[in-house]
């Protein structure tokens, strides 16, 4: 059984990513190369990495804040929207030189066929501003979760 999170103020700090899924059917092999051709019929976006940790804590009833770095891009906007919809207070330091990490998975007939990663590391200046926010937010947290996926947001 999980502990009761309803009264614990949770702060999640770490690497966020957008998990994208393209689902479809494979009916043939490409004539250009020996690879399956996927006819995409459905797509999904889900919070990944530290964003998924924050979403899971919020689902347990905890008031959750997430502190992270994202690019000034569509993927960063999507993550902020998805987390807002899950009642996560999102504090994102947006870096114009950073591509928000995306993990794109292509699924055919219930089998993952391919994963494509889009990622870059955040700037030193953005990390310093995040550190300043962390010091401010720490006093209001009962639980702190550091979620490091090696993308440069923590290490």
Tell what function each PLM region has.
Residues 29-32:
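Flexible glycine/proline-rich, aromatic-decorated loop/lid segments
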Residues 1-27, 39-155:
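Ribokinase/PfkB-type carbohydrate-kinase core domain
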């Amino acid at each position: 059984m999980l502990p009761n999170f309803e009264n614990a103020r949770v702060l999640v700090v770490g690497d966020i990513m957008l998990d994208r899924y393209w689902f479809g059917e494979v009916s043939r092999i490409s004539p250009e190369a020996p690879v399956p051709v996927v006819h995409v019929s459905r797509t999904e976006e889900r919070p990944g990495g530290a964003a998924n940790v924050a979403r899971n804590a919020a689902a347990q009833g905890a008031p959750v804040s997430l502190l992270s770095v994202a690019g000034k891009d569509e993927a960063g906007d999507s993550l902020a929207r998805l987390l807002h919809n899950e009642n996560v207070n999102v504090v994102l330091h947006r870096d114009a030189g950073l591509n928000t990490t995306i993990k794109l998975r292509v699924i055919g007939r219930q089998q993952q066929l391919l994963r494509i990663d889009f990622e870059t590391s955040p700037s030193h200046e953005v990390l310093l501003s995040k550190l300043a926010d962390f010091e401010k937010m720490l006093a209001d947290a009962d639980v702190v979760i550091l979620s490091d996926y090696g993308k440069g947001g923590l290490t």
